[in-house]
């Protein structure tokens, strides 16, 4: 299945922007050294491919997922092949001493791209994963930025999310706080970011789940009213690359997608997915009925789906890329908008947040409500609705 066909796009959303800047991209990449952190995820692999295909002087990729790193190398070797510059991968966490030694031994790098993130709304369900999400999305970002500054990197890029604009869940709020931390860091290393739409069929996404359910002969399940913007993996890689190379200091790139034309419901995507497989959806009234139906299929043309009204904590009916309070430039690129980061917090508030989180962890006493209250202090616009139910309680 071609991702673009699935999203009714004949070519990449950013093809005009990439074509317009291609010569500058190739020239800058060919003479530069890159470090990609979190390069084994869907977005990380897409960014790695975009850079690798343009012959960088050096490209090192770091991730904690060794299996995905192996597949990344196999994919590049089996498609693009080899480059004249250096290329290698390393199975390391940002928090480790080995990561710092890697930068010491193989650096300095001109560009550092941090694609690592805990991205799922369901991660806010317990204090342990929520604390880890804060570490990965906020503190690890700050650490890798400071290490980049120390070695004299020209540019630091990190990925944000559309959920950071008017957040309704704690995951989006952590990315909003990450943006605030970036705003307060002053150094010679330039910083840019990108707020993403959903990446179609990315690891762990609902669309990826559709493929998994189909392969395992299981029913599809999706919330009725939830709509999302989507980009393909290639588009995700292009957006990151353009922000990294051409983004000015403390700018956030986002795809120019609009609610009247580009928001797509998960239920309609489920129907498109099944149609692409030669099936049509048959709507079930419950999870049990959907699970049972597959054992009773006779003609092989129908696939059970359970669509339900969303009732889980942190869900947002439709995402957005910027707020009314933010300065936005819609003119510099064809299909990319730009938000200029603003200082909305003071440095003392951010330091207190970091100190209180560290105190909680050292005391070995993590409480979800306390962590949530700390987040609220930094993101007062957080519109968070507790329903008492989380996505792990859904099919």
PLM region spans:
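A short, basic/flexible loop-to-alpha-helix module at the beginning of a structural domain
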Residues: 9-32
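Strand-loop microenvironment adjacent to phosphate/nucleotide-handling motifs in alpha/beta enzyme folds
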Residues: 6-7, 24, 28, 182-395
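Hydrophobic/small residue at the entry helix of a nucleotide-binding pocket
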Residues: 43
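NAD(P)H-binding glycine-rich loop region in Rossmannoid oxidoreductase-like domains
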Residues: 46, 50-61, 77, 83-85, ...
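Helix N-cap at the beta1-alpha1 junction of Rossmann-like dinucleotide-binding domains, i.e.
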Residues: 63-68
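Hydrophobic Val/Ile/Leu positions in short beta-strands of Rossmann-like dinucleotide-binding domains
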Residues: 36-37, 61
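Conserved glycine-rich cofactor-binding loop
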Residues: 40
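Conserved Rossmann-fold NAD(P)-dependent oxidoreductase catalytic core, especially the SDR/UDP-sugar
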Residues: 114, 118-176, 184
